[in-house]
Regions:
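Helix N-cap/beta->alpha junction signal
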Residues: 32-34
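Phosphate/oxyanion-binding active-site loops and adjacent basic polyanion-contact surfaces
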Residues: 37, 62-70
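C-terminal accessory helical subdomains adjacent to catalytic cores in phosphodiester-
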Residues: 2-27, 38-60, 74-88, 93-177
Length: 177
């Protein structure tokens, strides 16, 4: 009886495997400022896009500066993102205005590079899903406003899961911007 051959994976097959009969989900690399942004991105992918996107997150800490986000997404794209359809930086304006030039340079490097900036914070974007509100609110007031309007019967907590009803109201927020 002959010995069975052991299967060795070549370097080319490492990484994302293609299931037979199916195409790969498009890979999108994200660098997010905080836990709330990461949770929101995952909720969007699940509830709005039906898990048709494969997200990959750059290793960032909560409250990352824009400089750190640009640096981390560049590293992630070099390591894992050569086949990525897009790369997104998601952050707030409240503490990032001074690093804007770096972001603009990164955006010019590739058509695959994108940015989503919320002003003053991502919670303002959440409020727009459920009501029209003043643009002049600061981050602290926005969080109080959101707490009153939070869907799902609970109060809002940074980094907590995002209710599907909020994601389903995305078109409302887009119209109110």
């Amino acid at each position: 009886m002959a010995k069975s051959k052991t299967c060795v994976r070549s370097r080319q097959s490492r990484g994302r495997r293609v299931p037979r009969g199916r195409s790969l989900k498009p890979l999108v690399v994200f660098a997010a400022e905080g836990a709330t942004e990461r949770v929101y991105i995952n909720a969007l992918i699940t509830h709005r896009y039906g898990n048709r996107i494969a997200p990959s997150f750059a290793e960032t800490r909560d409250h990352s500066s824009l400089t750190n986000l640009v640096s981390q997404i560049k590293s992630k794209m070099q390591r894992d993102g050569s086949g990525a359809e897009g790369a997104w930086i998601v952050c707030d304006t409240d503490a990032n205005a001074c690093h804007r030039e770096q972001l603009e340079e990164w955006l010019l490097e590739s058509e695959r590079h994108h940015v989503a900036i919320s002003h003053p914070c991502i919670e303002y974007w959440f409020v727009l899903h459920v009501k029209v509100t003043a643009r002049s609110l600061d981050a602290q007031h926005v969080v109080k406003e959101l707490d009153k309007e939070w869907l799902g019967g609970k109060s809002y907590k940074k980094g907590a899961s995002i209710p599907p009803d909020l994601i389903n109201a995305t078109e409302n927020a887009i119209k109110r911007v």
